[in-house]
Structure formats: structure tokens, C-alpha cells
């Protein structure tokens, strides 16, 4: 498994690779959100059913516009999300028609976050698009907190490990339904 800095990851991701990378709280697994083969590989590595959907993480909201149907949200709903970003808040938003079922699962919405983590922002800026994000663990297991855990659990299963530090968060992000304002998962 390659161990690289965020700036060196672009070609791996855009060519269908699956990576592990540090986020605000835990290591994440990620891939190109526009590559169904890469998404299916990520789901297989994690042993996660596609029906559950995945999160997209971005460096800014503009990167999410190809996936989120903002026309279904009011100005107030968008302003609420913008007031929490960048930060540890994931919003469930309506999807555009062309979004892959492997991203949204059985839902008519997608979970999105604008990250405050410098490494995640650097990855997304290098890709010029969001990154699929899910915790680096097998379904039902605890997420990886160290590079050593990634190497032990995912060598031979993923293409690269992004070097860097975890953020200060110790809980997963809070998930909020952007349309209703309902908290779906309390984090932080």
C-alpha cells in the first residue's frame, strides 16, 4: 500500500483507487464519487451494503453542486447548513437525478459535509471535486484511529494511505436533515 501526502493522491483517486485518509475524528475510506466501480470496491472492502448510502466530503459547497439539488431547499435551509460549515456537521440534502445509486443508496437524498480538516480540504481541492467518505472499518467494527490500524486492516485491499493527522474531534459528525432540521445523529 502506498503511503502518500494529499497532493500526491489525485491520480490514484481519479483512476479508480480507494484510499484511507485522516479526517476530523477517525480515518476515512474514500474514492471518486463519479466512478461506480471505485464506489463498489470501497463498499466491498468495508463490507457495507450499497443500500445504506455514503457521505460526500468537500472543501466547499460549490464542489457539491453536481450532486445536491439545491432547488429543493429554501434559502433558510441552505443558510443553516452554511452557518455550520466548514465543520463537523453532515447534512442530508436532496439529490440530482444523475447521482449514482451507490452514493445515495435507497434514498432520494445524499449526506454531504464541508470539512474543516486541512488534509481533507487539500484532497478535495487537488481532486477539484468531493470525495466519498465513510469511516475506515469493517461494518460493525470500530473505526481506525491510527495509520498502523489502517496498515494492519487494509493492506492489499486499498490503494493508498494518505499521511496526516486526525483532527481534534472525538465523535463522528452530527447528521442533520436539511429539509426538516431534524438531528438524525448527535455527534461532536
From Swiss-Prot:
Which cellular compartments is it found in?
Cytoplasm
Question: Nucleotidyltransferase: is it a keyword of this entry?
Answer: yes
Ranges where the YrdC-like domain occurs: 3-188
Signal peptide range in chain numbering: none
At the top level, the lineage of the source is: Bacteria
Give the UniProt keywords, A-Z: ATP-binding, Cytoplasm, Nucleotide-binding, Nucleotidyltransferase, Transferase, tRNA processing
First-listed, main subcellular location of the protein, grouped into a coarse class: cytoplasm
Q: Name one GO molecular function term.
A: L-threonylcarbamoyladenylate synthase
Q: Name one Pfam family in it.
A: Sua5_yciO_yrdC
The record's EC number reads: 2.7.7.87
Q: Which GO terms describe its cellular component?
A: cytoplasm
Gene3D superfamilies for the chain: DHBP synthase (3.90.870.10)
Query: Reaction catalysed?
Result: L-threonine + hydrogencarbonate + ATP = L-threonylcarbamoyladenylate + diphosphate + H2O
Q: Name the InterPro entries on file.
A: DHBP_synth_RibB-like_a/b_dom (IPR017945), Sua5-like_dom (IPR006070), TC-AMP_synthase (IPR023535), TC-AMP_synthase_SUA5 (IPR050156)
Give GO terms for biological process: regulation of translational fidelity; tRNA threonylcarbamoyladenosine modification
| Family listed | Belongs to the SUA5 family. TsaC subfamily.
Q: Which PANTHER family match?
A: SUA5 (PTHR17490), THREONYLCARBAMOYL-AMP SYNTHASE (PTHR17490:SF18)
NCBIfam families hit by this protein: L-threonylcarbamoyladenylate synthase (TIGR00057)
Q: What does this protein do?
A: Required for the formation of a threonylcarbamoyl group on adenosine at position 37 (t(6)A37) in tRNAs that read codons beginning with adenine. Catalyzes the conversion of L-threonine, HCO(3)(-)/CO(2) and ATP to give threonylcarbamoyl-AMP (TC-AMP) as the acyladenylate intermediate, with the release of diphosphate.
Name the chain's protein.
Threonylcarbamoyl-AMP synthase
| Biological source species | Shewanella sp. (strain W3-18-1)
Q: Which lineage do the record's taxonomy fields give for this organism?
A: Bacteria, Pseudomonadati, Pseudomonadota, Gammaproteobacteria, Alteromonadales
Task: From the UniProt record, report the name of the gene that encodes this protein.
Answer: tsaC
Amino acid at each position: 500500500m502506498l503511503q502518500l501526502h494529499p497532493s500526491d493522491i489525485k491520480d490514484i483517486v481519479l483512476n479508480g483507487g480507494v484510499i484511507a485518509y485522516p479526517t476530523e475524528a477517525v480515518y476515512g475510506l474514500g474514492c471518486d464519487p463519479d466512478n461506480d466501480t471505485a464506489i463498489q470496491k470501497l463498499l466491498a472492502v468495508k463490507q457495507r451494503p450499497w443500500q445504506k448510502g455514503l457521505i460526500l466530503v468537500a472543501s466547499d459547497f460549490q464542489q457539491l453542486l453536481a450532486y445536491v439539488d439545491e432547488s429543493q431547499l429554501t434559502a433558510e435551509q441552505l443558510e443553516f447548513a452554511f452557518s455550520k460549515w466548514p465543520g463537523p456537521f453532515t447534512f442530508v440534502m436532496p439529490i440530482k437525478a444523475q447521482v449514482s445509486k451507490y452514493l445515495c443508496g435507497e434514498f432520494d437524498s445524499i449526506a454531504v459535509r464541508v470539512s474543516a480538516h486541512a488534509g481533507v480540504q487539500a484532497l478535495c481541492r487537488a481532486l477539484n471535486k468531493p470525495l466519498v467518505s465513510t469511516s475506515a472499518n469493517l461494518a460493525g467494527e470500530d473505526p481506525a484511529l491510527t495509520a498502523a490500524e489502517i496498515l494492519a486492516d487494509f493492506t492489499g485491499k486499498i490503494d493508498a494511505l494518505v499521511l496526516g493527522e486526525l483532527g481534534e474531534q472525538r465523535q463522528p459528525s452530527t447528521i442533520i436533515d436539511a429539509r426538516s432540521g431534524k438531528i438524525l445523529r448527535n455527534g461532536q
